[in-house]
């Protein structure tokens, strides 16, 4: 829940988990007791394996204000395994996962590279990057930039309050607000947003854009183009 998580897909069938516990306190004994109370649990399930962090309860959270803590994970998983992650207050990085990926994170950067299968990503209060996915992707971010490239499948993306850059998606459906949106070298695309600019270049198929209170610039569309806006120019 609190700490950075790094996941790597590797050949073979072995799961390897490295966990690093970090505790800071004005009292050394208190820090050591708290660290000793953190449990790293690894268990088998019907569908695979589960890794979970358990933190101590009671006075540590309600009576003491001097302890800060995190558990950082470096996890190697069989590259064909599906992965599900839930984290708070830390960065999450996933690379070379080929069995589908589901990640929910908050208050940190989320980066996924070189995946295959369906990717479901959700983040808040941090940047989100998806670079290379051989499959569909469903991506949601808030309060941070979104950068997506090389999605060989349908991309459904949502973002608020951060710049959005999307390149080379096989098919795109984007919705958002309060953000500048840039789309390039995509298949059929739909963009719905407000209070930001929309720039689209090179669409191999139809393009539909709805932008309120922001300009629209589009070029290189091979199919039909439907561009709707208000209170700002449209350039095509």
Predicted regions and their residues:
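Short, intrinsically disordered, charge-balanced linker/junction segments flanking boundaries
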Residues: 1, 228, 233-236
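Acidic (Asp/Glu) and glycine-rich low-complexity loops/linkers
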Residues: 4-87, 91-141, 145-159, 163-176, ...
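Short helix-to-loop capping/linker segments positioned immediately adjacent to catalytic or ligand/cofactor-binding
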Residues: 197, 215-216, 233-236
């Amino acid at each position: 829940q609190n700490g950075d998580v790094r996941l790597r897909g590797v050949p073979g069938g072995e799961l390897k988990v490295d966990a690093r516990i970090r505790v800071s306190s004005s009292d050394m004994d208190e820090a050591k007791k708290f660290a000793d109370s953190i449990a790293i649990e690894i268990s088998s399930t019907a569908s695979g394996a589960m890794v979970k962090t358990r933190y101590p309860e009671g006075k540590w959270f309600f009576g003491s204000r001097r302890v800060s803590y995190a558990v950082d994970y470096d996890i190697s998983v069989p590259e064909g395994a599906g992965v599900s992650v839930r984290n708070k207050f830390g960065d999450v990085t996933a690379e070379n996962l080929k069995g589908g990926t589901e990640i929910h994170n908050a208050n940190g950067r989320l980066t996924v590279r070189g995946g295959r299968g369906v990717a479901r990503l959700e983040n808040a209060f941090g940047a989100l990057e998806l670079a290379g996915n051989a499959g569909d992707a469903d991506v949601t971010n808030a309060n941070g930039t979104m950068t997506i490239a090389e999605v060989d499948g349908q991309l459904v993306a949502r973002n608020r309050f951060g710049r959005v850059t999307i390149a080379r998606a096989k098919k795109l459906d984007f919705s958002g607000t309060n953000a500048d949106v840039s789309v390039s070298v995509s298949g059929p695309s739909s963009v719905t947003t407000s209070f930001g600019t929309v720039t689209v270049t090179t669409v191999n198929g139809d393009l539909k854009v709805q932008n309120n209170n922001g300009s629209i610039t589009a070029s290189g569309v091979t199919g039909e183009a439907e561009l709707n806006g208000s209170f700002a120019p449209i350039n095509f």
